[in-house]
Amino acid sequence: MEYITKMVHDFIEDHDDIKKTDVMEFVGMSESAYRDFFKKGKISFKKLIKFAQLISRETGKGSHEILSEWCLHIIRTETIKNAFEYSAITTNAPLLKRLLLLHQNTDGVLKQTVEVYRIVYNYMVGTLSGFELKDAIGRLHNITSKPLLILMNIIRQYNNYFEGDIQKIINEVSEIQKDITNLGPRETFYKECLTFRVCELLAPISLQLNDVKSARDFAESIINANISAKKKSDAYYVIGMSYLPDDKNVCLYNLRKSYELMREVGDLQYIQEAKFNLDFAKVFHGVELDEDSNFRLRAYQKARNGKISLAKLHTILERGDKDNFIIFFENTAEKSIDVMYNCLESFFCQENFFFARLVAKELEKAGADSRALRPFLKFKKLIKGEVLIEKDIISHFNRSDGGSRICI
């Protein structure tokens, strides 16, 4: 901890224009708390984030970079736990790995922390699949820390999501939220991070259930938290898709934003997925695709425009996995009312009400009875129970390194 206090002290000493009162106000510390930090190294993780942001603002060095370095010098148990969650929620796998190695021989609550976050790390780096999470969590015993128990329950919901068991998630999420709300004042950082994780889980689920207002609210909370480009990109995807049937310009703006952010992330697979999502929306709205667009999307657009046969399209669509997008293509390309109604029924029975709505839109374009389609165009399923969210769920992450806010 001495490493951190010395770095902060030297920073303040080197900047004559920065007064102690200004620092205390920025970080949100009383005079006594300020003294305790420098004399005893006593400070909450949230206050460390504010110090990192202050130094970042004046030096140009990224606050995440500064904080990642500090996480390796923290000595108090509660703050170390927060460092683990910080590394996980910001998807900083290298930092999480170093924390796991640093604390691998601990006992008590820290041992529990290492056991839980080792599973998180293995999932992050791909050595553990989403379908294996529940079993991995089930092998953990004697976990007593309330935040860790809540995190374990959220991880189980990731497994349920991969298995397509949306109803089980809906049944359990309100209890998870109650448990988060009941966390004490010492667990404020965890409370906000766990709430963020609930938003991250429910944003795509609400979209699938065609509850677009909730989907947008959850996504806005994720964007405003400003945790990472990857998470913001995922949130812009949800917002963009939620406008797909109704507002071409808003839809394309948000999906383009998602794509641009994913390019910042630099992961080729994620970039390709974001580009696919943007181009899918372009096809849906009749916008000509670029030559570098996905070959199946271009084939679908050509078939819709009569440039290739439906037989050739189906041959092309057979290459690769079949997700909801490809199923949509296969069943709407020939504009057959019967085929599209069967597809609509299939999506609806699977409770994928958003894609059911997209097919209903295509049926409407093809001349099907709009009165019969009205229930499918408007149907949505609400998640039972109140999920308490705020746009500023993680207020201490809201300040970017440049000091500006992220807005939609």
Feature annotation, model-predicted:
Residues 77-89, 112-127, 151-166, 193-208, ...:
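Tandem amphipathic alpha-helical repeat scaffolds
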Residues 85-99, 122-138, 161-182, 206-221, ...:
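Helix-turn-helix repeat elements of alpha-solenoid scaffolds
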Residues 1-3, 43-47, 72-81, 107-117, ...:
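Generic helix N-cap/helix-start motif at coil->alpha-helix transitions
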Residues 46-63:
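DNA major-groove recognition helix of helix-turn-helix/homeodomain DNA-binding modules
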Residues 1-17, 22-30, 259, 280, ...:
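C-terminal non-catalytic interaction modules
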Residues 60-190:
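Long, mid-chain structured domain cores
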Residues 38, 69-74, 100-109, 136-147, ...:
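Solenoid-like repeat scaffolds
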Residues 27-45, 69-74:
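Recognition helix of helix-turn-helix/homeodomain-like DNA-binding domains
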